[in-house]
């Protein structure tokens, strides 16, 4: 059974999904970060594939992507690192990147090798729904690779229902229409949007992302979904760390600590 399926069957609340950019701060940090995220209590890890034109990402993730590429990160290197990490942890792993990267590598080859490296799911923000239905779904299903789609406050209800049916991993509920990394208090308008998504009673688990940055915003997001995704705040913590393993553990512990 896919590890994502196992996770959501075993736990349906307060799921912590942490995103980081593979190959950042240093090329060989990927496995160390994965192992320490798992050890510290993260439920799910979203591994970002560095890309030169990350259109959905804010400045923090863009800079980390450029640094990772300069460090020498490639898809081949990433798959090798993931295979090494998978030998030491069974935590669900999701790759987040862009469909252009998959197309350049070859879709079937990419999915096959990602699965062999221990990847459980994909998030590809630029993958059109029609392209997924026409070609990519069969490839993903053949390798038990779950695919997650994103919805935003501007996504029409009918479209949300369609995407909810197509997402085979979880539904990525984007908290705002801005790029990633814009943190702050979750607004009343955002809460109303989350409640609207809840009311649709969609079949897939829902994780809220974009702007989740600390224990308080994580807990608030979890009131409206099965869990939340934290990315830019973690990358900022890694950027200033002398000890990546320690910084990773301390970050997760800070997110999971009780909120007064």
Residue ranges and their predicted role:
Residues 16-20, 45-47, 93-97, 122-124, ...:
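Hydrophobic faces of well-ordered beta-strands that scaffold small-molecule active sites
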Residues 145-181:
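Histidine/lysine/aspartate-rich catalytic loop segments that bind and position anionic ligands
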Residues 27-37, 155-166, 200, 208, ...:
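Catalytic cores of alpha/beta
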Residues 42-53, 119-123, 127-130, 171-182, ...:
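Glycine-rich phosphate-binding active-site loops on the catalytic face of alpha/beta enzymes
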Residues 1-10, 27, 52-63, 70-83, ...:
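Active-site-adjacent beta->alpha loops and helix N-cap segments on the catalytic face
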Residues 18, 37, 45-48, 114, ...:
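Conserved, mostly hydrophobic/aromatic
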Residues 41, 114-121, 140-147, 165-171, ...:
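Glycine-enriched alpha-helix->loop->beta-strand junction motifs that scaffold or abut catalytic
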Residues 78, 195-204, 213-219, 223, ...:
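Alpha/beta catalytic cores of nucleotide-metabolism and tRNA/nucleoside-modifying enzymes
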């Amino acid at each position: 059974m896919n590890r994502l399926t196992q996770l959501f069957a075993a736990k349906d609340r307060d799921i912590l999904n942490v995103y980081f950019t593979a190959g950042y701060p240093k090329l060989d940090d990927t496995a160390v970060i994965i192992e320490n995220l798992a050890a510290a209590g993260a439920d799910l890890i979203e591994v970002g594939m560095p890309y030169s034109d990350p259109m959905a990402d804010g400045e923090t993730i863009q800079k980390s992507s450029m640094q990772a590429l300069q460090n020498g990160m490639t898809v081949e290197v990433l798959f090798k690192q993931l295979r090494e990490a998978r030998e030491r942890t069974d935590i669900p792993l999701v790759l987040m990147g862009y469909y252009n990267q998959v197309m350049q590598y070859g879709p079937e080859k990419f999915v096959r090798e990602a699965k062999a490296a221990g990847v459980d799911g994909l998030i590809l923000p630029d993958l059109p729904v029609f392209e997924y239905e026409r070609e990519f779904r069969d490839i993903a299903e053949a390798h038990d690779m779950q695919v997650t789609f994103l919805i935003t406050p501007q996504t029409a209800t009918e479209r949300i229902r369609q995407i909810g049916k197509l997402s085979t991993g979880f539904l990525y509920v984007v908290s705002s229409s801005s790029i990633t990394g814009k943190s702050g208090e979750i607004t009343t308008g955002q809460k109303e949007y989350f409640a609207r998504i809840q009311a649709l009673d969609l079949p897939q688990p829902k994780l809220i992302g974009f702007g989740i940055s600390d224990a308080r915003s994580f807990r608030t997001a979890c009131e409206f979904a099965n869990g939340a995704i934290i990315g830019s705040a973690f990358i900022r913590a890694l950027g200033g760390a002398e000890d990546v393993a320690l910084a990773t553990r301390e970050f997760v512990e800070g997110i999971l600590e009780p909120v007064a």
